[in-house]
Amino acid sequence: MSQHTQDNQINNNETIEIQETDTVPVETNSLQSGLTSLIPMILIFAVFYFLLLRPQEKRRKEREKLVSGVKKGEEVLINSGIYGIVTKVSENDNNIEIEIAKDVRIKAIKSAIVDITSRKREVAATQENNKKNKKVSCAKSS
């Protein structure tokens, strides 16, 4: 019996007290971790959109406006590096005719137009006139 009492004493000395604590459900943690791993992906997509896609869309719209507004008599540059004057614009089949030298005409599609150089010259001339007018008005007021 002495051995039995020694075992009881050992068991009494080795008892562990467990205290109850408030626990957070596991489902909430997994939902939060899922959302936090999704946030970087959303940020990457937003950066991609604003740095690449949006500017490209703007350029495409500007180009469409440029190409659709080409008129007879304008000087253009096409993507093959040829300058010429538009002699004919076909609205239905999207073609233009360009005179590159006297009595030398070629056909091209409108999307081949890289730039309308006559418009740039007009803008540059207008800006030059504005600068001259400002200088003259400043000189008169002095």
UniProtKB/Swiss-Prot annotation:
Keywords: Cell inner membrane, Cell membrane, Membrane, Protein transport, Translocation, Transmembrane, Transmembrane helix, Transport
Annotated SMART domains: YajC
Keyword Transmembrane: yes
Protein topology in the membrane: Single-pass membrane protein
InterPro entries: Preprotein_translocase_YajC
Gene Ontology biological process: protein transport
Region Disordered: start-end pairs: 1-21
Annotated GO CC locations: plasma membrane
Pfam family, any one: YajC
Compartments where found: Cell inner membrane
Membrane-traversing stretches: 33-53
Chief place where the protein resides: membrane
Domain of life from the UniProt record: Bacteria
Keyword Cell cycle among UniProt keywords: no
NCBIfam families: yajC
Subunit structure: Part of the SecDF-YidC-YajC translocase complex. The SecDF-YidC-YajC translocase forms a supercomplex with SecYEG, called the holo-translocon (HTL).
Function: The SecYEG-SecDF-YajC-YidC holo-translocon (HTL) protein secretase/insertase is a supercomplex required for protein secretion, insertion of proteins into membranes, and assembly of membrane protein complexes. While the SecYEG complex is essential for assembly of a number of proteins and complexes, the SecDF-YajC-YidC subcomplex facilitates these functions.
UniProt similarity note: Belongs to the YajC family.
Stated name of the protein: Sec translocon accessory complex subunit YajC
Organism: Rickettsia prowazekii (strain Madrid E)
